[in-house]
């Protein structure tokens, strides 16, 4: 473990965390207001107690936030820049629609629809999960919603995540998860920041706080550093690079079980299961995820051994895999820039990638007759560069953009005063009503009990005593309070831009269908900025999902779509369909596509269009 690297990132975390400390406090207050805080802010601290509370809360913060919730997930729209790529654009679009159905986007969207207007923004974390497997595929996309409380952006950079040198995430994890994934024992570490997991903020015995820093490396790629407390978990200079095992002696790649070389396979140890193709493990940048590898652990004869364990500690009866070229049993991991293709590949769209080709070379031996070097022929594979997304795996969604601010504008901040005034008036109205009541007047010498019995007898001595008997009802006048309460509520709605028509309530001001349509259109204009920012975030998310799929989905993936008549149609997303060759013979990956959101939503999903 590199202590200097650990201290460097711990210092960066502490420095940037302190700059956003006031924002974190404000985030907690916003959550309390949304959940219905009874606290009343004092008008003048000198004359009013700071711990005043209302016995009754009309939660206008929650009401106006819930009125804006849209359960419809934006649909992807992919446009090809080149005409010949139209079919590929349609496959990408259908693939993204399938991913929206496979992933729990209904729950993710439901959560983000509340986080974003409450806090002013939220984020999505895109990862490649190699533990998700089927019989024919290895790895799947994974998208996780990130609360702003879990983000530590680089201080002073407000233009966007891609402009930052680094960004740090705080993720609550269990100790067992850390051990399974990284092979590191963190049982002695405590939960450093329990607030990031939400709830009451209490410390859980089995939880720890994992910090993940994504940074821009010197080559322009993405690096990653992760730690828990004082334990380093990962340090990957090129987080999105492929890592394969090579022989420490001769430098040749470790062969897989399906290479087709009988002599080579005879030198390998017998495996119970077939070894899958090279791929990234756990997340992009980790070693190949075969049956011998799981996160930062290795399976050796059915037992899990940490990566950092010394080779001498392996079971005595375990026969190490032997290099078929030099016989060495020592292997090291290396970052690979190119993929070697030995067998020709033909994709579902008919694209053909050539395999190994014959190449003539000089052996170094001299011909006895001519004295010239002896030529020989060898097979040389087609070398294709591995694709890298070169993007931070974090996508930010803002509520409304604000200059000089990392997150957008919060709706809760705009109506905090109105919520406080509402709490104050509710308390005042209740105090008046509770203080009201009935009073009975009797002569001074009267002895009439007050109980539930009727027809009690009282004999006044004089007519004057009889005239003194009476009942007075004292009622507090709350008409002005209620009138102002309605005014404050309407004020809050106007600040956010919510109308009765948008909420589906009876609107007495709209006396015709045209008036209804105009009222809904006004609301749509007020909230248009939020929808634009939402669509922009989803468009960036769709692009990142495609790039991760292009980089790490080694096997062709089935894609279901519908044709013009609504019948099911099945296609294939194959990353090699995006592999192109320029005029000079160099191979490159075609990712030149435009990503937006499809605004042609059905009428039932468009509340503004329902009035048209």
What spans do the regions from the language model cover?
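Extended, helix-rich architectural segments
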Residues: 1-327, 331-346, 354-356, 366-370, ...
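Secondary-structure capping and boundary motifs in well-ordered enzyme cores
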Residues: 53, 84, 88, 477-484, ...
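Short coil/turn segments at secondary-structure boundaries
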Residues: 77-80, 107-115, 125-130, 432-446, ...
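Short, well-ordered alpha-helical packing segments
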Residues: 93-100, 109, 113, 121-125, ...
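Extended amphipathic alpha-helical segments with heptad-repeat/coiled-coil character used for oligomerization
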Residues: 130, 514-612
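Short linear proline/tyrosine/threonine-rich motifs used for host-factor recruitment
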Residues: 224, 304-306, 373-377, 568-572, ...
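Structured mid-domain segments that build the active-site/substrate or prosthetic-cofactor binding neighborhood
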Residues: 372, 376-521
């Amino acid at each position: 473990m590199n202590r200097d690297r650990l201290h460097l990132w711990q210092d960066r975390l502490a420095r940037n965390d302190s700059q956003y400390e006031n924002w974190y406090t404000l985030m907690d207050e916003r959550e309390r207001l949304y959940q219905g805080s009874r606290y009343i802010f004092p008008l003048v601290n000198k004359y009013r107690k700071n711990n005043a509370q209302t016995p009754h809360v009309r939660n206008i913060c929650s009401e106006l936030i819930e009125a804006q919730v849209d359960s419809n997930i934006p649909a992807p729209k992919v446009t090809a820049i080149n005409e010949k790529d139209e079919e590929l654009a349609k496959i990408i679009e259908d693939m993204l629609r399938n991913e929206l159905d496979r992933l729990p986007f209904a729950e993710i969207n439901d959560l983000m629809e509340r986080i974003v207007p409450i806090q002013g923004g939220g984020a999505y974390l895109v990862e490649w999960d190699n533990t998700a497997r089927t019989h024919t595929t290895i790895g799947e996309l994974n998208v996780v919603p990130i609360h702003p409380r879990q983000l530590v952006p680089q201080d002073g950079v407000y233009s966007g995540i891609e402009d930052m040198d680094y960004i740090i995430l705080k993720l609550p994890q269990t100790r067992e998860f850390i051990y399974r994934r990284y092979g590191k024992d963190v049982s002695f570490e405590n939960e450093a920041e329990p607030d990031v997991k939400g709830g009451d903020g209490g410390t859980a015995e089995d939880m720890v706080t994992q910090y993940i820093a994504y940074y821009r490396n010197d080559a322009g790629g993405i690096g990653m550093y992760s730690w828990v407390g004082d334990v380093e978990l990962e340090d990957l200079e090129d987080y999105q690079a492929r890592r394969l095992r090579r022989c420490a002696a001769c430098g040749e790649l470790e062969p897989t079980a399906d290479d087709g070389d009988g002599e080579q396979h005879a030198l390998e140890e017998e495996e119970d299961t077939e070894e899958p193709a090279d791929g990234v493990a756990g997340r992009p940048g980790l070693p190949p995820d075969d049956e011998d590898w799981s996160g930062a652990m290795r399976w050796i004869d059915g037992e899990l051994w940490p990566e950092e364990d010394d080779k001498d500690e392996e079971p005595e009866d375990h026969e190490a895999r032997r290099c078929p070229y030099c016989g060495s049993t020592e292997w090291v991991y290396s970052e690979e820039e190119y993929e070697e293709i030995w067998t020709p590949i033909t994709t579902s769209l008919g694209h053909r990638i050539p395999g190994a080709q014959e190449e003539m070379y000089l052996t170094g031996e001299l011909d006895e007759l001519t004295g010239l070097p002896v030529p020989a022929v060898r097979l040389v594979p087609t070398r294709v560069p591995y694709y890298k997304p070169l993007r931070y795996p974090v996508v930010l969604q803002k509520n409304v953009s604000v200059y000089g601010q990392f997150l957008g504008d919060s709706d809760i901040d705009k109506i905090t005063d109105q919520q406080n005034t509402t709490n104050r008036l509710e308390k005042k109205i209740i105090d008046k009503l509770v203080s009201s009541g009935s009073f009975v007047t009797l002569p001074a010498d009267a002895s009439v009990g007050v109980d539930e019995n009727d027809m009690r007898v009282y004999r006044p001595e004089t007519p004057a005593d009889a005239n003194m008997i009476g009942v007075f009802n004292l009622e507090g006048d709350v008409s002005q309070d209620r009138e102002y309460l309605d005014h404050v509520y309407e004020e809050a709605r106007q600040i956010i831009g919510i109308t009765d028509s948008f909420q589906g309530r009876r609107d007495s001001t709209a006396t015709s269908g045209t008036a209804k349509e105009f009222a809904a259109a006004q609301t749509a204009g007020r909230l248009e900025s939020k929808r634009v920012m939402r669509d922009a975030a989803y468009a960036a998310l769709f692009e990142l999902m495609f790039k991760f799929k292009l980089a790490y989905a080694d096997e062709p993936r089935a894609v279901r779509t519908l044709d013009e008549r609504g019948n099911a149609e099945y296609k294939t997303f194959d990353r090699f369909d995006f592999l192109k060759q320029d005029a000079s013979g160099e191979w490159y990956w075609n990712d030149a596509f435009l990503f937006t959101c499809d605004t042609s939503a059905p009428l039932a999903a468009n509340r503004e269009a329902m009035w048209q």
